[in-house]
């Protein structure tokens, strides 16, 4: 709970200190992973009471919001009940909702914590706690996307799409934690968890592909105009309309038991971990699509697909670790872990477009696939024709069955060292390596492939962590992690997926493992007397033999053929700097500045050079392996590279006194992208904003606040995305009742109705711009009530019980969790 939620009469003593991590507190080994916490000592008889708030709101455009939290404190326990529902795209609780589309979020839950009052880490100490949570989101979204794919020879393929969707997702989670110290040297920790989720979805997508920019050809809304457009230069490639709907569910239960024993020698520990999990899931989907190929004399492809994908997974594991002090401030830690994992998955795809042809071959020319789907002929017996309906509609090529049995082992060796100096400085570092042998047995069936594969691999994962604590407010940290990743077993099987008529994929038996190097450097400092602080960070990620999909694009049909391949040259790096300082003798002014600079080098393989030799593999019976072998042999697969720089800056200056707070701010984001294959992929995108804000604290417990900013975008092909938006928000609130613990407020968002949601993204081979719908402009009227009743009967009789606290603004609640120091 924030300090402002607690009346000062409750507090006997307050101190700040660096709380050690769970690992340090249990093992006695200082790992340097502290966090600064406030330790509150509450007056006798005052650790007993209720704290909470209620907030209800309704507004224009049928927007509404309601949330509450009620917290019960006793000497050795804490209970919290929270709940909310809104359709303002605010998920509350941080585990629901979203920012795209229009989302209605519902959540509720209970959190509790209890201990028996024994001193920390003493014999007989027992702690338990947990929570049960429910959340649901219902969303409606509309998206418009313009995409450009970079092709060899200075060419590009352009696609434009519009989509509408409805989604429902709900989750139930239950977590429990039990910790016991049978004696001062032994710690037992048990953590079981359960979760259930289910959802359903519907979407309608309409897209069109061109071999030249439709905007340069004169179209303003390509998706709406392409069907009736004369297309004098024949730039239309295909049009695709697709409907999807489906549902899914998942159940999971897991648990972890940890037993730690501190041995006689300080720093010597033995730890045993046992755990396991079991989950089941299923998803069903139905899709219908129609593709028109304009470069192929009006050829059309219609598909009707039903898919069901049940799966079952379980695993169990054990881990034994031992820590031995070898020198002063130095310990050596070793561990061994073994895990058995089972996964059984099935995908059954039923296709109705192939059924019509099969029935016609038996002389049933008047029975259509759509009639069968609609159930018109469900009661008809086709056995007299020698037809097994279930076999006819099963898409053997795209149905699959896979069973995995994995035996994973991990051997870890870690060296930890700490040096402490008289001036208060500390040096810490740990270095280690994981060796991870793995055996996987897979049984796989798909189309004509029915195989069993056994794979033995060995992964390595080195890591290094250095921390120099320069002072209580300043430190330097350096971290490095190396990771080896193996291709999935399915990616190694050369079997085709033709379920999408415009995107066909296959595996690659020649894939090799990939390697990633990641590093982070962080430095921060804070001058308490001057209230000045800064933080500087740098990071980088280098990928070797990264696995990326190589794409061959057919300019006649708009169809893509994809295969995973190893490729070198993918890396990215970035920096971030933040600075904050108070200004003036009274520290009334505050200056904040931050800047980020990111660079990415994305690589991929692509080709559109389909000569007569290549077309022999796709115009007849599709042969993906032959196609990629031919293109690779002749050097027709070209490496594409997109280099992009992203620069962001923000500056804010505030002035504050008891009456008002006023500020000005400005920011910009610049994206510079260059593609070595297509000059049209060389883009410069700008987003910049500037504005101000004011807060007035009026003498009759009224507060007025407002902010305004000019936000602009530049560099988009679709002129409607190059916007100038003046965003103005305002709020007025009034506290009332004797203790000022009730508030009524009026909020008006986007008063001028100009805000929109637009984004741009890059990869090695394409660029995409996306617009998403949302309700940005509305008025909300809030009624907020807060209460704070702390202290037992004796304390209240002494005059300390009527303490309605000074909670300000909307109380968002949250999931408590733990005692929060000694409160």
Predicted regions, residues:
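Short acidic/polar hinge/loop motifs at secondary-structure boundaries
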Residues: 1-19, 75-80
């Amino acid at each position: 709970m924030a300090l402002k939620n607690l009346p000062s009469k409750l507090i006997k003593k307050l101190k700040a200190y660096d709380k050690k991590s769970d690992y340090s507190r249990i093992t006695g080994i200082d790992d340097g992973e502290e966090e600064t916490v406030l330790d509150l000592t509450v007056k006798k008889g005052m650790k007993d009471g209720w704290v909470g708030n209620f907030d209800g709101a309704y507004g224009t455009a049928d927007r509404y919001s309601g949330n509450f939290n009620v917290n019960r404190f006793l000497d050795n326990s804490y209970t919290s009940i929270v709940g909310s529902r809104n359709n303002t795209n605010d998920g509350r609780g941080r585990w629901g909702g979203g920012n795209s589309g229009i989302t209605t979020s519902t959540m509720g839950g209970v959190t509790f914590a209890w201990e028996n009052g024994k001193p920390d880490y003493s014999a007989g100490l027992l702690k338990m706690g947990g929570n049960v949570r429910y959340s649901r989101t219902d969303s409606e979204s509309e998206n418009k996307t313009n995409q450009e794919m970079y092709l060899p020879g200075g060419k590009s393929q352009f696609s434009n799409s519009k989509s509408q969707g409805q989604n429902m997702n709900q989750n139930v989670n239950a977590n429990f934690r039990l910790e016991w110290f049978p004696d001062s040297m032994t710690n037992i920790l048990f953590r079981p968890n359960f979760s259930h989720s289910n959802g359903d979805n519907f979407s309608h997508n309409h897209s069109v592909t061109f071999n030249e920019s439709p905007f340069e050809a004169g179209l303003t809304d390509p998706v709406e105009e392409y069907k009736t457009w004369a297309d004098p230069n024949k730039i239309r490639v295909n049009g695709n309309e697709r409907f999807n709907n489906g549902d899914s569910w998942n159940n999971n239960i897991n648990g972890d038991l940890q037993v730690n024993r501190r041995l006689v020698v300080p720093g010597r520990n033995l730890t045993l971990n046992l755990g396991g999990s079991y989950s089941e899931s299923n998803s069903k989907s139905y899709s219908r699509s129609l593709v028109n190929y304009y470069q192929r004399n009006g050829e059309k492809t219609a598909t009707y697909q039903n898919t069901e994908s049940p799966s079952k997974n379980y695993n169990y594991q054990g881990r034994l670790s031992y820590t031995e002090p070898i020198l002063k401030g130095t310990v050596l830690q070793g561990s061994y872990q073994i895990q058995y994992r089972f996964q059984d998955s099935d995908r059954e795809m039923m296709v109705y477009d192939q059924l019509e042809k099969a029935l016609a071959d038996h002389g049933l020319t008047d029975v259509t696939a759509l009639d069968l789907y609609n159930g018109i002929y469900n009661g008809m017996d086709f056995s007299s024709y020698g037809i097994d309906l279930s076999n006819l509609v099963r898409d053997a090529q795209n149905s699959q069955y896979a069973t995995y049995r994995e035996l994973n082992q991990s051997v870890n060796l870690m060296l930890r060292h700490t040096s402490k100096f008289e001036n208060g400085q500390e040096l810490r570092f740990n270095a280690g390596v994981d060796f991870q042998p793995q055996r996987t047995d897979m049984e796989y069936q798909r189309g004509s492939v029915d195989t069993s594969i056994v794979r033995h691999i060995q992964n390595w994962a080195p890591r290094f962590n250095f921390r120099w604590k320069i002072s209580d407010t300043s430190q330097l940290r350096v971290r490095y992690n190396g990771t080896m990743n193996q291709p999935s077993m399915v990616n190694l099987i050369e079997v085709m997926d033709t379920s999408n008529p415009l995107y066909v994929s296959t595996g690659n038996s020649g894939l090799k493992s990939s390697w990633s190097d990641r590093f982070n450097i962080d430095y921060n400092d804070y001058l308490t007397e001057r209230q000045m602080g800064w933080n500087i960070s740098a990071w980088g990620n280098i990928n070797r033999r990264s696995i990326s999909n190589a794409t061959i694009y057919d300019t006649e049909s708009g169809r893509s053929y994809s295969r995973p391949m190893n490729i070198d040259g993918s890396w990215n790096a970035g920096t971030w700097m933040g600075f904050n300082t108070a200004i003036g003798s009274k520290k009334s002014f505050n200056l904040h500045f931050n800047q980020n600079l990111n660079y990415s080098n994305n690589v991929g393989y692509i080709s559109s050079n389909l000569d007569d030799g290549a077309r022999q593999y796709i115009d007849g019976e599709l042969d993906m392996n032959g196609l990629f072998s031919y293109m690779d042999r002749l050097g027709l697969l070209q490496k594409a590279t997109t280099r992009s720089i992203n620069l962001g800056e923000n500056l804010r200056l505030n002035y504050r006194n008891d009456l008002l707070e006023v500020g000005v701010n400005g920011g910009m984001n610049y994206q510079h992208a260059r593609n070595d294959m297509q000059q049209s992929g060389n883009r410069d995108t700008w987003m910049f904003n500037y504005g101000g804000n004011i807060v007035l604290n009026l003498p009759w417990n009224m507060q007025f606040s407002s902010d305004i900013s000019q936000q602009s975008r530049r560099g988009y092909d679709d002129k409607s995305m190059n916007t100038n938006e003046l965003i103005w928000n305002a709020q007025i609130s009034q506290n009332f009742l004797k203790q000022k613990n009730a508030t009524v407020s009026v909020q008006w968002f986007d008063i001028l109705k100009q805000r929109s949601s637009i984004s741009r993204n890059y990869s090695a081979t394409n660029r995409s711009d996306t617009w998403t719908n949302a309700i940005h402009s509305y008025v909300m009227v809030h009624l907020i009530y807060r209460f704070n009743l702390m202290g037992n009967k004796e304390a209240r009789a002494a005059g300390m019980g009527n303490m309605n606290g000074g909670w300000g603004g909307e109380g968002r609640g949250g999931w408590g969790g733990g005692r929060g120091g000694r409160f």
